[in-house]
Amino acid sequence: MNGDSPFTEYFGINSYDDSQDNYITVNNGSDQDAVVILKNITSKKIIRNVYINKHTSYDIRNIPEGIYEMKCVYGNDWNPNLLFNGMKLGMFQSNVHYSSQANYKDYFNMFSERTENGISIPYYEVTLHKVSNGNMRTKKIN
């Protein structure tokens, strides 16, 4: 399942830009699997949904330029046959909770920048468990 896109039928086909070598590394250090969702804050479009197994990492690559908010669905016991709004999308069956970035300052700026030394390509690393003195705040969502 690691790297699968379980909500594509609901959100649409994932968007990629092969001309961009940017990425977000997601380290899921928690005891729950997660589906990470990237939403472009300008267009409001969900451009990616990625399943990340507990205690694994995954690189979300070739993200179209833009500024993105990350939302997560966490849980255990994935059931691919569960229905959502009449669609068979699947969902976790236990320990389900949701989170989103709490502050716009934590959004991901995925615009490449030309510098005097060349092109600066954005990359980020996110850890999906509580980190003491961590630098990204989340809020619970429904």
Regions found by a protein language model. Give the residues of each.
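Primarily secretory-pathway and cell-envelope proteins
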Residues: 1-43, 48, 73-142
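Short, acidic Ser/Thr/Gly-rich low-complexity loop/linker segments typical of extracellular
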Residues: 49-53
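Exposed aromatic-hydrophobic patches
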Residues: 57-62
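A short tyrosine-centered beta-strand micro-motif
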Residues: 68-70
